[in-house]
Amino acid sequence: MWTLEDFVRESNRIEGIGEPTSAEIEAHRRFLAIPGISVADLEAFTATVQPLAVLRRHVSLNVCVGTHFPPPGGPGIELRLETLLEDATPESASAYATHLSYETLHPFTDGNGRSGRVLWLWMMGSAPLGFLHEFYYQTLRAQQGWG
């Protein structure tokens, strides 16, 4: 069974980041204990794991991720994130679909992968075999119509 520390280590490894700090592990622990996620909760989490990153709520905060061009920065980013989070409940939404929408929106200037994965884990409740294992099978189910 994977521990939270294993999850954080895997999440960092996906980004090419070294071993997690105690502050990063604690930020994950705090986030997972929140009953309902808000934009402010994601901002607080991201400030710990990527201190210079900010929410792209200002018009000039545009980013490019490889060949993906997320929506331009501005007030619409925060509004879209609020809408995404309103729908992001473990009971009513797919963690897989929410994660894809979050990464497509790319609401922060940096740290979106790790903040997106902690949101995914919050929705899942647990990932006994880790993010990559669970997300791999979620992707297969989504693409091939598996139950």
Regions found by a protein language model. Give the residues of each.
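FIC/Doc superfamily catalytic core
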Residues: 1-147
